[in-house]
Amino acid sequence: MKRAFILVLDSFGIGATADAQAFGDVGSDTLGHIADQCAQGLADNAERKGALQLPNLSKLGLAMAHKESTGRFAPGLDERADIIGAYAHAAELSSGKDTPSGHWEIAGVPVLFEWGYFSDKQNSFPKELTDRILARAGLDGFLGNCHASGTQVLDDLGEEHMRTGKPIFYTSADSVFQIACHEETFGLDRLLELCQIAREELADYNIGRVIARPFVGPGKGQFARTGNRRDLSVEPPSATVLQKLVEEKQGRVVSIGKIADIYAYCGITDKVKATGIPDLFEATLEQIKQAGDNTIVFTNFVDFDSAYGHRRDVAGYAAALEYFDKRLPEVLELMQEDDILILTADHGCDPTWPGTDHTREHIPVLVYGKKVAPGSLGRRDTFADIGQTLASYFGTSPMDYGKNFL
């Protein structure tokens, strides 16, 4: 029975890539810099303290993959762990360092074109675009129109939004158009309808995602995003390994978290909603228990990126990694004879780095299975090696990019 479980620790980079200079990210290292801060006692909080402790990830080869990427061991990680998995560090072939590019490349389809971006920090959006969106939505104005941190923009504009009913439009260094609205005063359904309008009006702009950012709370300092985020992505430019599994093998692909949104539902047969790392982990365990032949269970743990990476919260990121590590044996215990587990990431988001954007880094590729030979798989030239390996494993037609590493 062929089953594969892909767990994406969103933004968990393990060292800058050779092309990081083009992105302003030379020296970035999400794992290494978190470990450095922990070792120096600078990442203590109510949940954790001291050196970074990731014994189970280290057994799967995380510390070794990081060393092969950066030339050094991350302090606190076990350099002498008994390695039980195959490990690698992978560079990105895609032109960007964004979520869709990383995920699509993982599934065998790198993004070789350039996304459209709203590069102006202020007055970011063309007036003709926002005029069309407002007219179709029956709105008389909007707030924002800038690059912004997703939590700071709520403090800056949330109360005015509640008072006026005007949605908050903002963007970032990624190819995104984000809309924040209060779930209670504006309405979640209304926000999602507005995002669909924006998605349609952005057809000629080559923007990767429209993101609905619902929030709640009575006022500044008390606003909080809810778990009802939606990502409206464009479709991948060609068939991913997910689509090939479904179409060629009548297989199942179970999306947990925002996976379905990222792939614009292409190649997704089942969607499980869960919010927060504990609930995402529980949902993953449940779906592994239920999974049959020719099934991929695919989970994105978005909080590493959204709650800790972008927020530059080193202690929070470290605590979340340690929580994930403690629960990892629960997945390993469910593995059957022919199963494959792949732990990876889609880009970096170094919480010690200037700004609030992603970082261009190698991703870890940690592979475990009872029939997988442990040891180094070296440097992979593209995330698409994961997709090609899955295509070979499930016996689908091969992908155009990537090399099988098993």
From Swiss-Prot:
SUPFAM superfamilies: Alkaline phosphatase-like, DeoB insert domain-like. It is found in: Cytoplasm. Its cofactor is Mn(2+). Mn(2+) 1 binds at D10, D346, H347. Pathway: Carbohydrate degradation; 2-deoxy-D-ribose 1-phosphate degradation; D-glyceraldehyde 3-phosphate and acetaldehyde from 2-deoxy-alpha-D-ribose 1-phosphate: step 1/2. Keywords: Cytoplasm, Isomerase, Manganese, Metal-binding. Transmembrane segments: none annotated. InterPro entries: Alkaline_phosphatase_core_sf (IPR017850), DeoB (IPR010045), Metalloenzyme (IPR006124), Phosphopentomutase_DeoB_cap_sf (IPR024052). It catalyses: 2-deoxy-alpha-D-ribose 1-phosphate = 2-deoxy-D-ribose 5-phosphate; alpha-D-ribose 1-phosphate = D-ribose 5-phosphate. Binds 2 manganese ions. Mn(2+) 2 binds at D305, H310, H358. The keyword Cytoplasm applies. Gene3D superfamilies: Alkaline Phosphatase, subunit A, Phosphopentomutase. GO terms for cellular component: cytosol. GO terms for biological process: 2-deoxyribose 1-phosphate catabolic process; 5-phosphoribose 1-diphosphate biosynthetic process; metabolic compound salvage; nucleotide metabolic process. One of its GO terms (molecular function) is manganese ion binding. It comes from the Bacteria. Its EC number is 5.4.2.7. Its main location: cytoplasm. Isomerase that catalyzes the conversion of deoxy-ribose 1-phosphate (dRib-1-P) and ribose 1-phosphate (Rib-1-P) to deoxy-ribose 5-phosphate (dRib-5-P) and ribose 5-phosphate (Rib-5-P), respectively. Belongs to the phosphopentomutase family. This is Phosphopentomutase.
